[in-house]
Amino acid sequence: VEIFSLHAPGLSEYDVDRLPFSIKILLENLLRHEDGRKVTTADIVALAQWSLNPLAHGEAAGDAAKEISFSPERVLMQDLTGVPAVVDLAAMRDAIVELGGDASLINPLVPVELVTDHSVIVERSGSSESYEQNVAIEYQRNLERYELLRWAQNSYDRFRVVPPGMGICHQVNVEHLARVVFETDGVAYPDTVVGTDSHTTMINGLGVLGWGVGGIEAEAAMLGQPTSMLIPPVVGLKLVGATREGVTATDVVLTITELLRNHGVVSKFVEAYGEGVGALSLETRATIGNMSPEYGATCAIFPIDQVTLDYLEFTGRPQSQLELVEAYAKAQGLWHEPTAEEPIFSEYVELDLSTVVPSMAGPSRPQDRVDLPGVHRAFRAELGREPKDAIGVDAGASLRDGAVVVAAITSCTNTSNPSVLVAAGLVAQRAVERGLTTKPWVKTSLAPGSRVVMDYLDRAGLTQPLDQLGFYLVGYGCTTCIGNSGPLFDGISDSVIANDLSVTSVLSGNRNFEGRIHPDIKQNYLASPPLVVAYAIAGTVDIDLTIEPLGIDRDGVPVMLADLWPSDLEVAEAVRASVTPEMFTERYSAAFEGDKHWQAIDVAQGETFAWNAASTYVRRPPFLENLSPEPSIIEDILDARILAKLGNSVTTDHISPAGNIRGNVPAGEYLIDGGVTPVDFNSYGTRRGNHEVMMRGTFANVRLRNELAPGTEGGRTLKLPEDLEMSIYDAAMRYAIEETPLIIFGGKEYGSGSSRDWAAKGTKLLGVRAVIVES
């Protein structure tokens, strides 16, 4: 096997050995793709002497900031962002055929894996039938999208689809898809990935360099185009010591999120090193990598070591792959030796793991970590008044400010880690033994990121106690973490709105922005799975679980959290006895086959997609219609009108929302005209394959304020010169009839966020020729 050696004679004059591992991976990537055009010798030299660059010493780079072309080896997609990418590729095939070309020329040139995980919604919960009911609803709503994916699965080369119900893309990536090291045509090289989801960084825990990109960048990578990037600064995160008894991986990652947010790591790589690295399980490393977007880093990579190899073996990777990974990592200086000389980093941050304490984060930002005893104080500080009650929940029970109305064990961030899930099961088991139940207003759910989770919970005898507390399986997907929490229990929303209550959610997710989990929930707290169970029993966050009982047992004895919390040894022994390599091998042997619903989908044949003119989910986009072989000429913008004048921090979600569609907005009116009932509107995210919905949804976020229409929210503007107030979409269509070009003005931080492609496409479809902002 050949390699592009980082110790080649041409690099001997540079201190390559002390480069950060992440920079070494980038350097190998440039060496392998050098062509004198996209990647030049000057690019390679600039990266090889990274330690001499001002960036390496935490200084402003100035002219030293150099752009390079990085070529990822594969692309990972989820369905909300993946479906519009497939739509674009299908439209490219149509366009090339119309120009007299061969449709088969439009094919991915690198492996692409799309995991269908973002569409399942917790419509049903609290019963053994919840899972099947939610799956049936998911397929009924999303059949048109899934028909497209089935066609793509059969039509494209190097394109694989993991059907619904297998898990969350990042967890599936860590447990099965990631190679760590590739071998192709006798050449070995590092596995690198870009993904259409910001939490693609979870794979960093496995020593794989990767991060999230927009859909358009992912499409370019699929078609063999490199990703342009500035040579990054790298922050060294030195880990020392080991966690104390009772501290979970969630506590560690919330502490790191707070630490790195305060330090400042935006647009920087983070790389873990130090003797504490070896004390962390692979799953904990993956959890830390996963939350890179929350602390602002491009990625947060861990080096390859024996822990990596043990995990690869445990999850069913073949012995030959393990040997390749070890040999390659050691040959290229990518193997972590705690006693080796430290790499050179741009900046240094240190965390003593023994200082981490049980934590949560909230009420509205992942970096707002709170020690467990302080959660009730954080709630009251945000509330800003004395808590009040509202009567009328389940036979007279009292709903109060601080009530936990959603308690969700969810998200790839935590459900990839057997230790915290087993701990949750043990807490549930002890609670049931004491006769405790969850409060009647708490909507409980369990949505693992992998089918393996239910296998080992079953084997450990922990599924039943979780069920008894209402944590029934509701789906294998993102669910509550991305806002797919479904409706609250009957009467809860009405009571919350009528009494202006500040109710809460507790979830094992990664984001807790206001309004994200459910529009009627004002405060959201991130917590480990065992704490999710505890708060479901307590029913409120207005409590100090370290000194107050979370319930009274059947004998009238107060039950403290400490009475239910398992020891680290108990958790470790339960994990060791219940999680087996065979579970991973068996579950992933059919990763791409799908269930009976998937198999029953009628698969279209042919190299071009048969568009359904009646579809409200998938439409041929207009971007590639009537193309000419030559690029069009860019014309001057004359006699333009301002469509919107926006303020600061207008995110991609303000520009192109992903959430619910209301009936009284242009997108809702379009769907109603198409025969769709409001209950089946689904979300903007699931409608990203239909440009008609998406252009109507552009600038339609309910919280968007346009200074042209003061006093309004939700995508309103003034049509000029008539000064008529109307929706931004309706105004844009009137301007289009008048052939008037449009301009958007904005303040600072315009367009921050993820899912950038429709924020750009939708704006263009409205006839906007330029966006002028401060930053």
Residue ranges and their predicted role:
Residues 289, 463, 759-760:
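Generic hydrophobic/aromatic pocket-lining and core-packing "Φ" positions
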